[in-house]
């Protein structure tokens, strides 16, 4: 009796196992299993393990073959790792690798790409200023004295006359008007500062300017008189002075002594 009961029970267990093996996988088989080890609780999983699991899961997913119902539990657990989380980890790893490569290239100066792949806009180069000749500046200044703003006809005439372009003439007159405006503002500020000064300081400034003018005039007079002096540094003598008469008489006597007289035999 006991042997028959054991045989019946073993056959029942085999039928149950066979029925369980024939059952389809559960609906939430794609959901990854939540580990409860100490390392997983402390959030310190090994990187190699996650990458290997995701890599094998990716290979199994690319095969595009549904798992058979009679697979063992180990293969089912491996297939259960093919989850969106693994795909997200793989995508993130590729993204960070690309960012590292772009950062290294930017540091080495290989490419003008920024970290996020946007090309840097080159800086605009400033245009070189036109070098006007002295004749051109003289003619432009002379025209600016009585005409601050030019009509199109006048602008064309000046440009053709001086060998310039219309843009160069326009730019010169704009800069000249701006310079005149700055000069007027500086003069106005100087007048306002003089008005705020006390009378004593104004008198002191005037006396200093007068002294400077006097010293400059004295220097000019001394320079104008210096060529009239002789090489020896003495004043030139007038022809009617006694010193000149003595000097001429000495020269005449010396000439008379040097002259030889021829006597006939």
Swiss-Prot record:
Keyword Transmembrane helix: no
Any coiled-coil regions, as ranges: none
Keywords: Developmental protein, Differentiation, DNA-binding, Homeobox, Myogenesis, Nucleus, Transcription, Transcription regulation
Region (Disordered): 1-33, 212-265
Name of one Pfam family that matches: Homeodomain
InterPro entries: HD, Homeobox_CS, Homeodomain-like_sf, HTH_motif, LBX_TF
GO cellular component term, pick one: nucleus
Compositional bias (Basic and acidic residues): 1-20
Superkingdom of source: Eukaryota
Statement: the UniProt record of this protein carries the keyword Calcium: no
Bias-annotated ranges (Acidic residues): 253-265
DNA-binding residue intervals: 125-184
Gene Ontology terms describing biological process: cell differentiation; muscle organ development; myoblast proliferation; negative regulation of transcription by RNA polymerase II; regulation of DNA-templated transcription
Localization terms from the record: Nucleus
GO MF: DNA binding; DNA-binding transcription factor activity; DNA-binding transcription factor activity, RNA polymerase II-specific
The protein's role, per its UniProt record: Transcription factor that controls hypaxial muscle development by down-regulating myod1 and cdkn1b/p27, thereby allowing myoblasts to proliferate before the onset of terminal differentiation.
Protein name (record): Transcription factor LBX1
């Amino acid at each position: 009796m006991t042997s028959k009961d054991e045989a019946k029970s073993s056959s029942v267990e085999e039928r149950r196992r066979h029925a369980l093996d024939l059952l389809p996988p559960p609906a939430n088989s794609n959901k990854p299993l939540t580990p409860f080890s100490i390392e997983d609780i402390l959030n310190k999983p090994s990187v190699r393990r996650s990458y290997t699991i995701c890599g094998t899961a990716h290979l199994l997913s690319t095969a595009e073959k549904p798992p058979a119902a009679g697979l063992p539990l180990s293969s089912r657990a491996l297939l259960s790792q093919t989850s969106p989380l693994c795909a997200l980890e793989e995508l993130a790893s590729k993204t960070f690798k690309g960012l590292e490569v772009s950062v290294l290239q930017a540091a080495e100066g290989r490419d003008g790409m920024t970290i996020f792949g946007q090309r840097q806009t080159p800086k605009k180069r400033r245009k070189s200023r036109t070098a006007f000749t002295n004749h051109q500046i003289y003619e432009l200044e002379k025209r600016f004295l009585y005409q601050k703003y030019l009509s199109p006809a006048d602008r064309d005439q000046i440009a053709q006359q001086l060998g310039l372009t219309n843009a160069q003439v326009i730019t010169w007159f704009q800069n000249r008007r701006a310079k005149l405006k700055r000069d007027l503002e500086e003069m106005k500020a100087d007048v306002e500062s003089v008005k705020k000064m006390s009378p004593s300081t104004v008198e002191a400034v005037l006396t200093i300017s007068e002294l400077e003018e006097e010293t400059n005039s004295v220097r000019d007079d001394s320079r104008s008189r210096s060529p009239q002096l002789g090489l020896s540094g003495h004043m030139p003598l007038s022809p009617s002075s006694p010193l000149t008469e003595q000097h001429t008489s000495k020269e005449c006597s010396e000439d008379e002594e040097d002259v030889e007289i021829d006597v006939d035999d």
